[in-house]
């Protein structure tokens, strides 16, 4: 992995924005769920105020919207995006779920409206499904770049990894596999010898470097 050194963002810190509404999902590896159990003081107005403050401090930082599910409230997400000048890069972490009160056409229209502001959408699509997802066809319609993120959780089926990648070939999106953050420790973070995921990926695929949505 030394041939592909990790690179940090030039221009300031990365600001992570936890949207002030829950996703309604229960993914077993989610590290944010407990943040939504006590939403006291967690409001759209305060988040917008914080966004403006960070813009004053570091006018070229990256903003990453996560949650929760940012697309669960398109009006609120639009309000937050409207606070961010175009000097910043903006990333959105999402499952692109099926939503009450919003259609796939609504999601596509939202990306079209904000295509000059949204740098990339990081969409979770897992080998084992945990949420009700909208169709993969939306990847060919979204007006901004998309990267698919896949958490390889516990005893994932290795034999499904290649069919999983083949699933996204028609859409030309990048796919990132990652470890379960809830199981990550300082001791195992850089450990390669007993890393099952790393060995499975090396066995099935050829790593050529990082591309796609990089924060």
Enumerate the language-model features and the residues they cover.
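Short, well-ordered amphipathic alpha-helices
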Residues: 49-51, 106-107
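Acidic (Asp/Glu)-rich catalytic clusters
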Residues: 54-56, 85, 108-116, 135-143, ...
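Radical SAM enzyme [4Fe-4S]-AdoMet core and its adjacent flexible, acidic
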Residues: 40, 125-215
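Sterically constrained small-residue positions within well-ordered secondary structures
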Residues: 8, 56, 206-208
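Distinct, well-ordered alpha-helical segments
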Residues: 75-82, 100-113, 132-137, 158-165
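Canonical Radical SAM [4Fe-4S] cluster-binding loop centered on the CxxxCxxC motif
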Residues: 2-49
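Core AdoMet radical
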Residues: 32-42, 58-73, 86-102, 115-134, ...
């Amino acid at each position: 992995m030394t041939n592909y050194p990790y690179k940090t963002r030039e221009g300031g810190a990365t600001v992570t924005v936890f949207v002030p509404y829950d996703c309604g999902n229960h993914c077993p590896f989610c590290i944010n769920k407990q943040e939504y159990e006590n939403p006291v003081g967690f409001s759209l107005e305060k988040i917008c105020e914080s966004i403006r403050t960070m813009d004053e401090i570091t006018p070229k930082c990256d903003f990453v919207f996560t949650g929760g599910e940012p697309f669960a409230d398109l009006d609120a997400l639009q309000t937050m995006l409207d606070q961010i000048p175009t000097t910043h890069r903006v990333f959105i972490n999402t499952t692109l779920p099926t939503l009450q009160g919003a259609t796939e056409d609504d999601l596509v229209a939202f990306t079209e409206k904000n295509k000059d502001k949204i740098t990339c959408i990081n969409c979770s699509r897992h080998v084992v499904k945990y949420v009700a997802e909208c169709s993969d066809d939306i990847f060919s319609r979204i007006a901004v770049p998309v990267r698919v993120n896949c958490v390889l959780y516990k005893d994932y089926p290795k034999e499904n990894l290649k069919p999983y990648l083949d699933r996204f070939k028609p859409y030309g999106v990048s796919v990132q596999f990652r470890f379960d953050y809830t199981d990550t420790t300082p001791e195992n973070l850089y450990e390669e010898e007993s890393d099952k995921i790393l060995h499975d990926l090396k066995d099935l695929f050829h790593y050529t470097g990082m591309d796609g949505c990089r924060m």
